[in-house]
UniProtKB/Swiss-Prot annotation:
The gene is HXT5. Disulfide bonds: none annotated. SUPFAM superfamilies: MFS general substrate transporter. Signal peptide: none annotated. This is Probable glucose transporter HXT5. The keyword Membrane applies. Residues 1-43, 49-68 are annotated as: Disordered. It holds the Pfam family Sugar_tr.
Length: 592
């Protein structure tokens, strides 16, 4: 037992004086030093006894074990109706994904609409207007830069004022950006500025929404409820496509101002709905609002404040947060030097979020109408709706696959599926789409084949990488550094989103459907990376994930790892930490 653990005497009382440092996150640090905190060892040696912060001792270990048994029995007796309230609350938080998806779905159509091109495009010598590749790329992609900045900067509002208030604030910022876009008359840079500001808001949403869902939801439903965020994104994309289809025949600004006006309406709806959502109990415990935390837990789990479930969860929160307080506040440097294995975990989050973009999803979602116009379709808006339907329906399957098959299996099999789809899609586009040259009509059969495999690709993406990337990063970090780590990971997602969105018009002009081979190569790399570096987090609490990293479990054996609190006497920990097999056999053969 570490000095830090010995120092802990029990949970905080509601009357305890508690720091409101916005960077205080939970980490079971064992015997390790908390890097980035000056003089940690001296501070620990001279630390006041925890009894100076609290007024009663926590339950003995045997009482906690009995409490855990009572909680397990309580969970077994819970019906689906008992989880209805927390599910509805998480859906309301996940509605932030709908706001993001709506923007993605509508902008893909705006760049093909006549009034939008007339107002914000350039004029040729013959008087016709057009959107250049540069201007199109900037107006589409700058949103992602705003998101990257918002994810890092505005996500701190969740640490300072709570996840709930922080989320409502970033939605207001998003609304301001939408108002600026609607008010644009004929200056493309005004619309451009509005896109940046709305991106700031969405960047904050993408960090705070999954964070709040994962901290409010019961662990047995956490993967499913966090996946609802991605479900809402796909629903927003689909309805955005439908709205563009409904307004495309107008000849004035109704084409694009009506979809933008609905963006504003959705943001107002979310702000109102958020008033009914409970605050994160983890955050409330951290800032010393113990009674509020109990009420939030009881409300979310549809039980009483003195129930075994609430008592056990509060003890877990208070013990780990008090231990973290003695270690000091986290610095940004701790994402690199922290323990257990914080650099590896930070890098893993950055890689997973980057690779999610490098699957090529935004190639289809941002430029779907443009792509299928090139395939030879007369009404590419209709095909965009088909893609939107496939995306939305497929995401329903993810609510099952994420918790049924686990995070690793979803990512690995998702890579395999998308690789196969890209091979066919790109090969047909390169060799069969224009049998008589690009200046001649395209082959209808080849075009239809490409659409079918684009739909297969979207199914593979929507059931695997789309939701799992968010679920995985929400489960991989201790509360102590969670906000910082998630914001860095999300920023990587947005930066790659910007690069892909901006350069896609230029790349497709140069190499056309060879572009599919680029994404295929990224998925081959992703398969190997996930296999060797991404551990399974299914069914684990945030504290148990920390313990897994402390014990140096091999990622490809992490599915066999059992937390210390659940182990039997015959459990072999070394079997999960060592693998004598040659490198190539680890991936392609089962261990005997």
């Amino acid at each position: 037992m570490s000095e830090l653990e010995n120092a802990h005497q029990g949970p905080l009382e509601g009357s305890a004086t508690v720091s409101t440092n916005s960077n205080s996150y939970n980490e079971k640090s064992g015997n390790s030093t908390a890097p980035g905190t000056a003089g940690y060892n001296d501070n620990l040696a001279q630390a006041k006894p925890v009894s100076s912060y609290i007024s009663h001792e926590g339950p003995p270990k045997d009482e906690l074990e009995e409490l855990q048994k009572e909680v397990d029995k309580q969970l077994e007796k819970k019906s689906k109706s008992d989880l209805l309230f927390v599910s509805v609350c998480c859906l309301m938080v996940a509605f932030g994904g709908f706001v993001f998806g709506w923007d993605t779905g509508t902008i893909s159509g705006f760049v093909r609409q006549t009034d939008f091109i007339r107002r914000f495009g350039s004029t040729r010598a013959n008087g016709t207007t057009y959107l250049s590749d540069v201007r199109t790329g900037l107006m589409v992609s700058i949103f992602n830069i705003g998101c990257a900045i918002g994810g890092i900067v505005l996500s701190k509002l969740g640490d300072m004022y709570g996840r709930k208030i922080g989320l409502m604030t970033v939605v207001v910022i998003y609304s301001i950006g939408i108002i600026i876009q609607i008010a644009s008359i004929d200056k493309w840079y005004q619309y451009f500025i509005g896109r940046i500001i709305s991106g700031l808001g969405v960047g904050g949403i993408t960090v705070l929404a999954p964070m709040l869902i994962s901290e409010v939801s019961p662990k047995q439903l956490r993967g499913t409820l966090v996946s609802c965020y991605q479900l809402m994104i796909t629903f927003g994309i689909f309805l955005g496509y439908c709205t563009n289809f409904g307004t495309k025949n107008y000849s004035n600004s109704v084409q694009w101002r009506v979809p933008l006006g609905l963006c504003f309406a959705w943001s107002i709806f979310m702000i109102v709905g958020m008033t009914f959502v409970p605050e994160s109990p983890r955050y409330l415990v951290e800032v010393g609002k113990i009674e509020e935390a109990k009420r939030s837990l009881a409300r979310a789990n549809k039980t009483t404040e003195d129930s075994p479930l609430v008592t056990l969860e509060m003890e877990n929160y208070q013990s780990s947060i008090e231990a973290e307080r003695l270690a000091g506040s986290a610095s940004w440097g701790e994402l690199v030097t922290g323990k257990p294995q914080m650099f590896r975990r930070t890098l893993m989050g950055m890689m997973i979020q980057s690779l999610q973009q490098l699957t090529g999803d935004n190639y289809f979602f941002y430029y779907g109408t443009t792509i299928f116009q090139a395939v030879g379709l007369e009404d590419s808006f209709e095909t965009a709706i088909v893609l939107g339907v496939v995306n939305f329906v497929s995401t329903f399957f993810s609510l099952y696959t994420v918790d049924r098959f686990g995070r690793r299996n979803c990512l690995l099999w998702g890579c395999v599926g998308m690789i196969c789809c890209y091979v066919v899609y790109a090969s047909v586009g390169v060799t069969r789409l224009w049998p008589n040259g690009q200046d001649q009509p395209s082959s209808k059969g080849a075009g239809n084949c490409m659409i079918v495999f684009a739909c297969f690709y979207i199914f593979c993406f929507a059931t695997t990488w789309a939701p799992v990337a968010y679920v995985l990063i929400s489960e991989s970090y201790p509360l102590r550094v969670r906000g910082k780590a998630m914001s860095i990971a999300s920023a990587c997602n947005w930066i790659w989103g910007f690069l892909i969105s901006f350069f896609t018009p230029f790349i497709t002009s140069a190499i056309n459907f060879y572009y599919g081979y680029v994404f295929m190569g990224c998925m081959v790399f992703a398969y190997f990376y996930v296999f060797f570096f991404v551990p399974e987090t299914k069914g684990l609490t945030l504290e148990e994930v920390n313990e897994m990293y402390e014990e140096n479990v091999l990622p490809w054996k992490s599915t066999k790892w059992i937390p210390p609190s659940r182990r039997t006497t015959d459990y072999d920990l070394d079997a999960t930490r060592n693998d004598p097999r040659p490198f190539y056999k680890r991936m392609f053969t089962k261990e005997k």
